């Protein structure tokens, strides 16, 4: 079977993205990784870190890189990069990495995209007059013409998808509607089947309120919104259980046999996942017409070029992309 080929965008050049991308040369992965970034920056960062990495120009027709080699699709930075120091001039470079990866998907060169972290603040500083940049997920959705995507994090056998994502806690209850729950659950169910190869995925659903509302005594979102949504989805053949109290749901005996958890909001599900995965978590965007995984951490500017950056999440993100490529065959 032909090895999948992934575009790995190296992210914010002043952060740890280039550092962790270099470690792919030693990861022995069952795929090809084309690192999109400035080849001179990668060479300089390798020298600063004392890493002996051979950088080779990416050629879709070649057989790939050997151990200790890294395939690079060279995209020059706009200005010189200093580790740990953001430069708004290079915001356009970061977006060009994504645009090049998307073009490679469209041309059939890449089987998916794996993203190292970018810095949303510096991108917004640079393009204040052209609209707000929300992040990788929204950018890739817009560029690919995808109406709705779902954020799911995975690590060490646990998958957690979110109904709502980056909202203030005071706005969460109003944002959780029956149509939203149903559409998120459908995307989650579809991609577990078609991108992970799970024939009949079992999804555990969290309630919103403590004790999942205690039958309406601690809030009505479960009885008025969540339960009716789950009943509709079950009639469609989707295998759902819940809603369960979140403090019960994440116990091992509950998770046994489950393929994913659907949490109602960001800090209901992700702290558990991140604690469970110990820095090996992966951010997965569901609903896109291609595979996209990412690290679950930020740019860590203070760690750039120090040798203290951990590439575990990036390597796991690539391994997850491979799993998805195999599941979608």
Swiss-Prot record:
Q: Does the keyword Ligase apply?
A: no
Q: In which pathway does it act?
A: Cofactor biosynthesis; pyridoxine 5'-phosphate biosynthesis; pyridoxine 5'-phosphate from D-erythrose 4-phosphate: step 4/5
Q: Which UniProt keywords apply?
A: Cobalt, Cytoplasm, Magnesium, Metal-binding, NAD, NADP, Oxidoreductase, Pyridoxine biosynthesis, Zinc
Which residues are involved in binding substrate?
136-137, 274, 283, 292
Any GO CC annotation of this UniProt entry: cytoplasm
Q: Which GO terms describe its biological process?
A: pyridoxal phosphate biosynthetic process; pyridoxine biosynthetic process
Q: Which Gene3D superfamilies does the record associate with it?
A: Isopropylmalate Dehydrogenase (3.40.718.10)
Q: Which GO terms describe its molecular function?
A: 4-hydroxythreonine-4-phosphate dehydrogenase activity; cobalt ion binding; magnesium ion binding; NAD binding; zinc ion binding
Note in the entry? The active site is located at the dimer interface.
Q: Read off the HAMAP family from this record.
A: PdxA
Which family, according to the similarity comment?
Belongs to the PdxA family.
Q: What is this protein called?
A: 4-hydroxythreonine-4-phosphate dehydrogenase
Give the source lineage, highest ranks first: Bacteria, Pseudomonadati, Pseudomonadota, Betaproteobacteria, Neisseriales
What's the name of its gene? pdxA
């Amino acid at each position: 079977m032909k090895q999948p080929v992934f575009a790995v965008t190296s992210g914010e050049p002043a952060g740890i993205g280039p550092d962790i991308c270099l470690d792919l040369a030693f990861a022995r992965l069952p795929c090809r990784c084309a690192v999109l970034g400035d080849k001179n920056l990668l060479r300089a960062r390798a020298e600063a870190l004392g890493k002996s990495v051979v950088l080779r120009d990416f050629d879709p027709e070649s057989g790939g890189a050997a151990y200790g080699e890294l395939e690079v699709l060279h995209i020059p930075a706009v200005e010189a990069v200093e580790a740990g120091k953001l430069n708004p001039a290079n915001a356009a470079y970061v977006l060009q990495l994504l645009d090049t990866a998307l073009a490679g998907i469209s041309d059939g060169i890449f089987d998916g995209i794996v993203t190292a972290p970018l810095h949303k603040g510096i991108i917004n500083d640079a393009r204040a007059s052209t609209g707000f940049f929300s992040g990788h997920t929204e950018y890739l959705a817009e560029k690919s013409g995808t109406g709705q995507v779902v954020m799911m994090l995975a690590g060490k056998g646990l998958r957690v998808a979110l109904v709502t994502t980056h909202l203030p806690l005071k706005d969460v209850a109003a944002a959780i509607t029956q149509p939203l729950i149903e559409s998120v659950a459908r995307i989650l169910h579809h991609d577990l089947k078609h991108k992970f190869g799970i024939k009949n995925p079992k999804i555990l659903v969290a309630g919103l309120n403590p004790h999942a509302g205690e039958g309406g005594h601690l809030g009505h979102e479960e009885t008025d919104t969540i339960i009716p949504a789950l009943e509709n989805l079950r009639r469609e053949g989707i295998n759902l259980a819940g809603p369960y109290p979140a403090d019960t749901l994440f116990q091992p005996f509950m998770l046994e046999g489950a393929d994913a958890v659907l949490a109602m909001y960001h800090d209901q599900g992700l702290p558990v996942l991140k604690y469970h995965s110990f820095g090996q978590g992966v951010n997965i965007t569901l609903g896109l017409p291609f595979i996209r995984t990412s690290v679950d951490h930020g740019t860590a500017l203070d760690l750039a070029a120090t040798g203290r950056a951990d590439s575990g999440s990036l390597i796991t993100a690539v391994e997850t992309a491979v799993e998805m490529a195999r599941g979608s065959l």
